[in-house]
Amino acid sequence: MSTTTTPYVAFKVKDISLAAWGRKEIELAEAEMPGLMALRAEYKDEQPLKGARIAGCLHMTIQTAVLIETLIALGAEVTWSSCNIFSTQDQAAAAIAAAGISVYAWKGLDEESFDWCIEQTLFFGEERKPLNMILDDGGDLTNMVIDRYPELVAGIKGLSEETTTGVHRLYERVKAGTLPMPAININDSVTKSKFDNKYGCKESAVDAVRRATDLMLAGKRVVVCGYGDVGKGTAASFRGAGSIVTVTEIDPICALQAAMDGYEVKKLNTVIANADIIITTTGNKDIVLGEHFEQMKDKTVVCNIGHFDNEIDMAWLNKNHGASKIEIKPQVDKYNINGKDIIILAEGRLVNLGCATGHPSFVMSNSFTNQTLAQIELWNNSAAYKNEVYMLPKHLDEKVAALHLAKLGVELEVLREDQAAYIGVEVQGPFKPEYYRY
């Protein structure tokens, strides 16, 4: 596709007058994102991303604004779109646009605009220079470049991918032989999956449902579909609010973990009729189907905290009961099924970003510090990598964790030489073998 089909648009946001509000929130978030701020201080003179043109497709939130400005502080040029139609915080997008950064994002995109916004990030400035790095969340940007703009691939040094779903897409490409550049899997860094996915969801899942519904969660029967890291955090979130939580699972290991964590583990069909809230966390498709909707009681709340909107069969719901749909407020809709009202949050998309503001700044600093280190590594050392999916090395995973300890008042013990020799590690780490499971 010719670059002439994408004329230069400096930015597109909902309301640029929100910039001052967004800037205040960004400054507040910076105080809670010690990893990113430490990288700015460490690399400000070295400028390790100088010359990089990073196209990013990741939720355009206040926390993401801190990531964007970190990449720029390290020398990069950046363009940005959001990876979800509902996840943009308009004040964050406005603040980034007001800072002279090309951002194309607003809350409530339709599918056509969503695609348009991603496309705008492929070329930089009035000179329309093409991207040479990708920072993705879910794989939509990556797929657009590879499938629709293959002529740009040769100039791209690599990509980093944020989330479970996007990583799955990358491994599918490796298997099919269609991944044309090296990729770093951010999601499975310990300091991402065991923190963002678990502790982030532990705080943001309940926050979203409360904001959307004003329900008293204590005593409510909640079904959490899936018990991976996201499911673990989500189940803990509702348990902490006093809910009675049941888990569904396909994996015997995760099911055993859930049972030993004190949750009942049941088939969805056996518990759905009594559920007050159902939340999907699996990253798979077709978890809540038409047959399940028909079993739900009046006023059941249904939502999803996986990346895409295909865990809940919204197509069936809209085809068969769309005429009954009533918008209660943005991202909260009521459908009537056989005389019973079913409440759908965020149209089945990410509830914590559709109905709230996502994970707290501190835990996102973990994830985004990983992203920044991955971009530095691929930009400077791409020749060392094949067109495969890689993990950040353990010493960098440990570095990300270490950068966040002082904020929490954590003090580390230090190994003596004889102790390090005894367990076969260096005094300064890494402290665990690659096969260690945290």
From Swiss-Prot:
Q: Which GO terms describe its molecular function?
A: adenosylhomocysteinase activity
Under the heading Gene3D superfamilies, the entry gives: Adenosylhomocysteinase-like (3.40.50.1480), NAD(P)-binding Rossmann-like Domain (3.40.50.720)
Q: Name one GO cellular component term.
A: cytosol
Keywords, alphabetical: Cytoplasm, Hydrolase, NAD, One-carbon metabolism
Q: Please give the chief subcellular localization of this protein.
A: cytoplasm
Biological process, per Gene Ontology: L-homocysteine biosynthetic process; one-carbon metabolic process; S-adenosylmethionine cycle
Question: EC class of this enzyme?
Answer: hydrolase
Compartment(s): Cytoplasm
Q: Hey, which pathway is this one from?
A: Amino-acid biosynthesis; L-homocysteine biosynthesis; L-homocysteine from S-adenosyl-L-homocysteine: step 1/1
Q: What does this protein do?
A: May play a key role in the regulation of the intracellular concentration of adenosylhomocysteine.
This protein's name: Adenosylhomocysteinase
Organism equals Flavobacterium johnsoniae (strain ATCC 17061 / DSM 2064 / JCM 8514 / BCRC 14874 / CCUG 350202 / NBRC 14942 / NCIMB 11054 / UW101) (Cytophaga johnsonae)
